[in-house]
Regions:
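Gly/Pro-rich interdomain helix-loop hinge
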Residues: 176-214
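Glycine-rich phosphate/pyrophosphate-binding beta-alpha loops
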Residues: 45, 152-185
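Glycine/threonine-rich beta-strand-loop-alpha-helix active-site module
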Residues: 1-82
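Beta-strand segments within the central parallel beta-sheet cores of soluble alpha/beta enzyme folds
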Residues: 21, 146, 186-188
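A general structural signal for well-ordered alpha-helical segments in protein cores
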Residues: 4, 97, 124, 166, ...
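Carboxylate- and glycine-rich phosphate/diphosphate-binding segment that chelates Mg2+/Mn2+
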Residues: 53-161
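Buried hydrophobic packing segments
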Residues: 3-7, 11, 103-104, 127-130, ...
Length: 214
């Protein structure tokens, strides 16, 4: 989906020859409205179908480049649970961890808002139940559908706040060591959660049970 989102704004601006050069030189030009994008996620984790971001990995330089702006929102987002029931355990777990990371990083983000907090908390409450269920029962469509909801909600949350340190630390792990993105994001979450737990409880005291389940 990220590739489609980037190409949708790059093609009308004639910036695809080659596209990597525009990222390597820096995004100093104006990017305008692009082609319509219908985003249909086949995993439950990135939330890219509802975010104004797109990430491109430059393997030759081992760098991550991002585009962000209102012009990056897909025109439509379609979620079909049938596209996720055949996912492997890894392709269920790693994106699921990414969704949880999005929700947590949005919660303790300095840019958090009441709206982003509500979406993050709802995403977490769904994911902590639905992800183990989807891993245990891969063809449980209700669990798969709930993970799609968690992914979408956490995507909407980071659309307001962006991500935070867990994602920043994850990028070298992915680019230099090939660690899958969601797994790389999850490595630091236990310690970050420990550090931020007092703030989270103070912010949402009625969610103590949820935080204890993480």
């Amino acid at each position: 989906m990220d590739a489609a989102k980037v190409l949708a704004v790059a093609v009308p601006c004639n910036r695809i020859n080659p596209l990597a050069n525009f990222f390597r030189r820096g995004l100093d030009a104006t990017w305008g409205a692009g082609l319509p994008v219908v985003a249909i996620p086949t995993t439950s984790g990135t939330g890219a179908e509802v975010t104004p971001f797109a990430t491109v990995w430059d393997r030759s330089t081992r760098k991550k480049h991002s585009l962000a702006g209102h012009f990056m929102y897909p025109t439509h987002a379609l979620l079909d649970v049938e596209l996720t029931v055949s996912l492997s355990r890894e392709d269920t777990l790693y994106p699921g961890l990414d969704a949880i990371s999005h929700a947590l990083e949005s919660l303790w983000n300095k840019h958090s808002t009441p709206v982003s907090t509500a979406m993050s908390l709802e995403a977490l409450s769904i994911a902590v139940e639905a992800l183990p269920q989807a891993l245990e029962r891969p063809f449980d469509r209700f669990a798969r559908e709930r993970m799609q909801q968690a992914s979408l909600l956490s995507g909407l949350a980071i659309s307001q706040t962006r991500t935070a340190i867990a994602h920043s630390i994850s990028y070298p792990l992915t680019s230099y060591f090939g660690v899958p993105h969601g797994l790389a994001c999850s490595f630091t979450l236990p310690e970050l959660l420990r550090l931020n737990l007092p703030m989270l409880v103070a912010k949402s005291p009625h969610q103590r049970t949820l935080f204890a389940a993480l």
